[in-house]
Amino acid sequence: MKLLESVLLQSYVQNIMPLSSLKMLQTQQRNAQYAAQQRYLANLQAQRQQMQAQRNYNNDPYITNPYSYSYRVGNTVRQTNQYGADVLKQAVNYGYDQGVQAGRADRQDRRPSSYRNAFGYQDANYGYSGQYVAQSDYNYYFREGFRRGYTDGYGSTSQYGSFNNGSGSILGNVLTAILGLTNLR
């Protein structure tokens, strides 16, 4: 539990936009981006509240299961098991979903396309529980999904995935290409 609280607190303290920055969005009449960032922050808070249960290391299958996949973060090769692979997939999907919303918000606000300036891209912790993979790995894959989602949302396209009923989903072949998981068995 301490790790999760530490991760979320670090995200809140270091990466959450100060109130003055949010007010700046309102001043610039960037209402859609302001609303998107407010939703992102509310979702982070809800996530924190949902993950209050203590992690039981004695029965955690992640601890007892051997590595079954390798993956790359930049030029570094890492290894994980099925639980970690699932978290990385989740990171890409959450990133795509949040990217679509941020891209749509910038388009609605008639702002230039700039995924790197989006708060969700900078934070990249949405959905991270502090388990199974390093936070930096989660952030990397979240941003890979975010970038593609932002492109689809800003351009009103479905090049990398789809967005239906308020939820985005990246295409399976795109997900596979991003992750580049290699089975070790």
Predicted features and spans:
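Intrinsic-disorder/low-complexity detector
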Residues: 2-185
